[in-house]
């Protein structure tokens, strides 16, 4: 059993902080002590912009639109994420959550200082993801484990990828 602490870029399964009976899956972008900024749709960690490269647009098969698709690198992890250029950066409906005072919300987005023993999680479909920007930090005791493959995504088999 792999019992290493989550690292930036890892995709983790965790108990949802607002309802621990639910398991969620998101990418770790902030470790305890990090400052995470998502401003004008750009992610920075500890003042350093996350390296990104725009690639081809992603067609949403169930909808009639495309999203910009990027490749990003956090630490040793390279991954793809979607960004809807028409969606606002503003996070209008963030809830009250423990350590919310560690976050500053403005028209450009959010900046948060991750408290000790917690993680900041973001979804790879950035503009359609309810994640730490909305409901706060994930306590270490809520971490279930690291995800390592997509199981039965029948709508888009190409997303399954390969094992490493």
What are these regions (language model features)?
Residues 1-164:
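Soluble "head" domains of membrane/secretory-pathway proteins
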